[in-house]
């Protein structure tokens, strides 16, 4: 695996190194030792799959607060997404900055999202599937979110948002979230 730092402290793009032959290829997509060598959280508590039927579907921006903060490893296994993370760690040099990248099934690139980051994505194709590996179990009482179009972050989505859940649409602006600790 090839680990590439993003502009956000602690977040990485991870590319596979396929070994191919006449059968196809073999590639490692997770290795505890390699994650530890790069200072990444190697714990695996839960894996999730998100199927998104329509292009323009938005999910996010989600995170969990302590003591249930989670790191995520995100990969698009069918279709394509525009993936976005926001650094919400107050002691970070990249606090409130965001990073985005297109992830597709074709290139198999993954995004490592550290604890304390909000995460979300917009589907770029119909029938898009996303696979997540999480370092922590889902804890409803620790779940938080900010709106995908919150002006505090200035995220530019590459296409119109056509489908978004009521929950994701109703998240408050960042300032009220920060003041409430939510």
Feature map (PLM): residue ranges:
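Conserved SET/PR-domain catalytic core that frames the SAM/AdoMet-binding pocket
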Residues: 104-121
């Amino acid at each position: 695996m090839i680990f590439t730092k993003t502009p956000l402290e602690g977040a990485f793009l991870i590319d596979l190194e396929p070994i191919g032959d006449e059968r196809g290829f073999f590639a490692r997509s997770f290795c505890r030792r390699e994650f530890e060598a790069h200072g990444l959280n190697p714990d695996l508590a839960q894996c999730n799959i998100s199927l998104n039927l329509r292009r323009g579907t938005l999910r996010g921006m989600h995170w969990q607060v302590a003591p249930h903060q989670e790191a995520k490893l995100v990969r698009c296994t069918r279709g394509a997404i525009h993936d976005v993370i926001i650094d919400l760690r107050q002691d970070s040099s990249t606090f409130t900055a965001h990073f985005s990248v297109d992830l597709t099934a074709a290139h198999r690139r993954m995004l490592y999202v550290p604890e304390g980051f909000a995460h979300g994505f917009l589907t770029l194709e119909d029938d898009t599937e996303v696979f997540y590996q999480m370092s922590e179990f889902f804890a409803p009482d620790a779940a938080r979110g900010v709106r995908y179009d919150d002006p505090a972050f200035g995220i530019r989505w590459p296409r119109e948002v056509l489908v978004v859940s009521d929950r994701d649409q109703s998240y408050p602006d960042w300032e009220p979230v920060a003041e409430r600790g939510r």
